[in-house]
Amino acid sequence: MRVRYKPWAEDYLKDHPELVDMEGQHAGEMTEWFDKTQPIHIEIGSGMGQFITTLAAQNPHINYISMEREKSIVYKVLDKVKEMGLTNLKIICNDAIELNEYFKDGEVSRIYLNFSDPWPKNRHAKRRLTYHTFLALYQQILNDEGDLHFKTDNRGLFAYSLESMSQFGMYFTKINLNLHQEDDGSNILTEYEKKFSDKGSRIYRMEAKFHSQK
């Protein structure tokens, strides 16, 4: 996805430190950042925030973190949080490789990866969010009952992710090869999911856990 640069976005985000972490000021203190101590769920690569804000509105008993590195997109998530008055959703503007700088071991209950960049060239495999170095980070911060939810329209990335997770020692509790035909009605659409689905694209989804989180 090509992101149009917004020169004012960084200053706008910095004006809301109670909602947005720009420079790691809450690193290691995620639980304390929220008003209530509740399970923490993360979406990595939140885009414009439709998925994560909908989840937060539906589940006030869960604390959510939107992690998105593109400042020129994050402001849209911030606008939604403010408009909806969500107190259980915070935003980290940083790269996923920094996850263990923000979260303590076992602090997270669920991680969402929705329509991540597939990085189709083999030489870019290390950038895929289901590459083994990222899986190691997820394993570190997830608690013993924690799980990973993954959605994509990219068949190649889905196949790669199944193999990568299996080789890493994960197991699958749910796999959908055509989500919108199989879904039970609980699926929450992302902005891109609706766009892809309207074009007739098949949506793939899985839920996975680590055999041993630690």
Swiss-Prot record:
Family under the similarity heading: Belongs to the class I-like SAM-binding methyltransferase superfamily. TrmB family.
Pathway of action: tRNA modification; N(7)-methylguanine-tRNA biosynthesis
Stored Pfam families: Methyltransf_4
Enzymatic reactions: guanosine(46) in tRNA + S-adenosyl-L-methionine = N(7)-methylguanosine(46) in tRNA + S-adenosyl-L-homocysteine
Active-site residues (renumbered): D117
Residues bound to substrate: K121, D153, T190, E191, Y192, E193
Residue positions binding S-adenosyl-L-methionine: E43, E68, D95, D117
The keyword NAD is assigned to this record: no
Organism: Staphylococcus aureus (strain Mu3 / ATCC 700698)
InterPro entries registered for this protein in UniProt: SAM-dependent_MTases_sf, tRNA_(Gua-N-7)_MeTrfase_Trmb, tRNA_methyltr_TrmB_bact
Gene Ontology cellular component terms for the protein in this record: tRNA methyltransferase complex
Keywords linked to the UniProt accession: Methyltransferase, S-adenosyl-L-methionine, Transferase, tRNA processing
CDD domains assigned: AdoMet_MTases
EC annotation from Swiss-Prot or TrEMBL: 2.1.1.33
Name this polypeptide is given: tRNA (guanine-N(7)-)-methyltransferase
Entry function: Catalyzes the formation of N(7)-methylguanine at position 46 (m7G46) in tRNA.
GO molecular function: tRNA (guanine(46)-N7)-methyltransferase activity
Enzyme class per UniProt: transferase
